[in-house]
Amino acid sequence: MAYYRTPHDVTALPAWQALQKHRDAMQSFSMREAFAADAKRFDQFSLSACGLFLDYSKNLITEQSRDLLVNLANEVGLQDAIKSMFSGEIINASEGRPVLHTALRRPVGDKLSVNGVNVMPEVHKVLNQITELVGRIHDGLWRGYSEKPITDVVNIGIGGSFLGPELVSEALLPYAQRGVRCHYLANIDGSEFHELSANLRAETTLFIVSSKSFNTLETLKNAMAARTWYLAQGGSEAELYRHFIAVSSNKAAAVAFGIREENIFPMWDWVGGRYSLWSAIGLPIALAIGTANFKELLSGAYTMDQHFQTAPFDKNMPVLLALLGVWYGNFWDANSHAILPYDHYLRNITKHLQQLDMESNGKSVLQDGTPVKTDTGPVIWGGVGCNGQHAYHQLLHQGTQLIPADFIVPVVSFNPVADHHQWLYANCLSQSQALMLGKTREEAEAELRAKGLNEADIEKLAPHKVIPGNRPSNTLVVERISPRRLGALVAMYEHKVFVQSVIWGINAFDQWGVELGKELGKGVYQRLVGSLEDSAEDGSTQGLINYFRGRHRG
């Protein structure tokens, strides 16, 4: 039976139990000693794929560790699970849906049936729609109510309708097309809309309302605010269609808002929000970098899809990263994972990966609804490299928790300034090196002695300068950030998350936990504005409602 119909108890598998024994044997393993003993360790634990280079040699593993982890992947039926996803089986069991974001990057001529219908012609029809719209806007043919060309595009969306597109359009800023600026409006906080609209002119602004249901609270409220602002700035209801388009599966609601049907781009229920940047949700990406570059992004992701499906697990980049995550989360008690990009343009990748990983694998039941017997998804956190060194890297080096990290760095900068990039790259490498090597008591004492400190002061200060080392990390190197390589990088992390969900036996493609807060929020709002008089379900919430009502004016 397919893994999503009869999930396994992973802790009962022979491979899992073998890993538990191996973990005990690895208690005294030292990466420092492993590198000293094996000149080929770097070569044995590194690989290239799809324009990415992965060094995973600075991990608490041996070749036996890798073999045992690959055995685990085989025992959970990972190869069949991969085939199930790519062929359109209903692996999102709780919602009864296939999972086919990978179809969005498949080339023309491919066939893929969902419920007996080949979906690929529709996928490429939408891609052609995107190409046509982007061309009109870039050529100055799409004009606002005053007949001036569009200069600014505002994407109104939240979650997956925002994080992925923002990541890509900012990561590929060096590829930005002249004449059109892209902005993002996500939060329901009025200050965000105020700050954004202050720098826009209604007559040359196009809003994209991105919401599958056309009913997402934050998105709908911001769309209404944009509509009100547009009218107040001199726009008319009759010309509204020039300034609002939509990406939604709810055509009726979008048309009722004032958007013309031909300006509504479809969404499919087999593409989840956090996997949707490859769809029409990526329209702001195409507007920012042009459709040729957008198609390169898709092509890069497709190459990673091919690698994921065909490479042996011990040479498969997403699989190896997933297995290392399981190794640390389930056998070394790691509760979080740091993402550390050493590139200004990649500064938003951590936010995207937070949603991708935590919304996917933040689950506590198996696919059949029974409780899991082991920890699942970790906390994902981090930020831009050098800034982090002067903030939270201290915890990575000398804290009590084991926190694996991914360093991401390009070889070539788009904007070289003197020797800045050489220092940036050096900082990235030295941080991963310091995490691995650490500093022994003897080294700390020798360092202080060389500075001329007396023995009494050395005795006091040396313990504070000891750094445990043996902290694991991966280093992902790209020659230069490009649409193709970025597509491969994001797809790699998508597949990593999926692999971990298969191992744990959970559903990576639903997000029921998000819904409860939305439901309760309606009641809280009604009590805040006085339209509901009964008390909240608990005293804390009611107390905070009372505090607001006693002080808010307006």
UniProtKB/Swiss-Prot annotation:
Record field: catalytic activity: alpha-D-glucose 6-phosphate = beta-D-fructose 6-phosphate
Cysteines engaged in disulfide bonds, as pairs: none
Entries under InterPro entries matching the protein: G6P_Isomerase, G6P_Isomerase_C, Phosphoglucose_isomerase_CS, SIS_dom_sf, SIS_PGI_1, SIS_PGI_2
GO MF assignments: carbohydrate derivative binding; glucose-6-phosphate isomerase activity; monosaccharide binding
EC code: 5.3.1.9
Cross-referenced CDD domains: SIS_PGI_1, SIS_PGI_2
Pathway(s) per entry: Carbohydrate biosynthesis; gluconeogenesis; Carbohydrate degradation; glycolysis; D-glyceraldehyde 3-phosphate and glycerone phosphate from D-glucose: step 2/4
Subcellular location: Cytoplasm
Matching Pfam families: PGI
Described purpose of this protein according to its UniProt entry: Catalyzes the reversible isomerization of glucose-6-phosphate to fructose-6-phosphate.
Protein name: Glucose-6-phosphate isomerase 2
Originating organism: Pseudomonas putida (strain ATCC 47054 / DSM 6125 / CFBP 8728 / NCIMB 11950 / KT2440)
Gene: pgi2
